[in-house]
Amino acid sequence: MAEPDSVNEAKEKKKKLWKAVFAISGIMLTLVIYGLLQEKIMRVPYGLKKEYFKHSLFLVFCNRLTTSAVSAAALLASKKVLDPVAPVYKYCLISVTNILTTTCQYEALKYVSFPVQTLAKCAKMIPVMVWGTLIMQKKYRGFDYLVAFLVTLGCSVFILFPAGDDISPYNKGRENTVWGVSLMVGYLGFDGFTSTFQDKLFKGYNMEIHNQIFYTTICSSILSFTGLILQGHLLPAVDFVSRHRDCLFDIALLSTVATASQFFISYTIRTFGALTFAAIMTTRQLASIMLSCIWFSHPLSWEQCIGSVIVFGSLYAKTFVKKKSEKPPAAQELPRDEEAQPLKGNP
């Protein structure tokens, strides 16, 4: 009996290994491509006239429309009803804050580089903790506050001490331009609320993940489309992509990888848990920063290198401490990274 048991155990380990390779490869590939495409679309000029794509809300519309179509197909394929589980206004509230989150994210890329933005996203721990306390009445450990402080400190160092040669194509100011930082602060605040309210919605209703994805993204599609019409940006955006087919291809690929990343994220969390996912996401962020620096020639100052070490060192420490903890209090865990949320591909 011992030999068959050992054979079965070896097969299970091999099966789990291949699942891990599939999950890690999927997340790394889709979200790294997503990050690079974001920066390319918003910061690299198109055509002989060197025109910049400036309609960030159009990107939100394309992303959400693609995700809503795929989630609807997933619900129909699994023979689950499309009826809303929660009141529609709650889906709309998530949609509004998510649109504001994503718009701030794309707009910020006009003034700060992708490495700055990616590292700044790590500072979302503080707004998430604030919203978690206000909305969910959560209580956090002293270690959580320490990690949040260190991550914010590292992000501040990274933003305040840019390399002198990395200048925004939209503005002659440095990366610590007031407008760029203000957009990132808006992103962090709106994203923290979105993540916390999504968490409350999942716990308050017996809800399938695809149900929430479908209704929030369909609301986001309608709202972003309305915003494009009211601002008069829909026709200029369509005209731009019709003149620059490479931009249209980039936007289509961005929407595709953003949607695909959600399925890899859901699969990873369901198969390996949130802690393993957190470690993968931290590694993905580090890889994205390094690739962006190489691909788009972003110089890093030595202060920024120190800030990066502080941020990623703190995040890895947080993951390993929680993994070793025998009694991880679920109520004290911070919500997942923004890409873990159903609406984020945003990555």
UniProtKB/Swiss-Prot annotation:
Keywords: Antiport, Membrane, Sugar transport, Transmembrane, Transmembrane helix, Transport. SUPFAM superfamilies: Multidrug resistance efflux transporter EmrE. It is found in: Membrane. Residues 325-347 are annotated as: Disordered. GO terms for molecular function: antiporter activity. One of its GO terms (cellular component) is membrane. The chain crosses the membrane at residues 17-37, 57-77, 116-136, 143-163, 177-197, 218-238, 247-267, 293-313. It is a multi-pass membrane protein. InterPro entries: SCL35B1-4/HUT1. Sugar transporter involved in the transport of nucleotide-sugars from cytoplasm into the Golgi and/or the endoplasmic reticulum. Belongs to the nucleotide-sugar transporter family. UDP-galactose:UMP antiporter (TC 2.A.7.11) subfamily. This is UDP-galactose/UDP-glucose transporter 5.
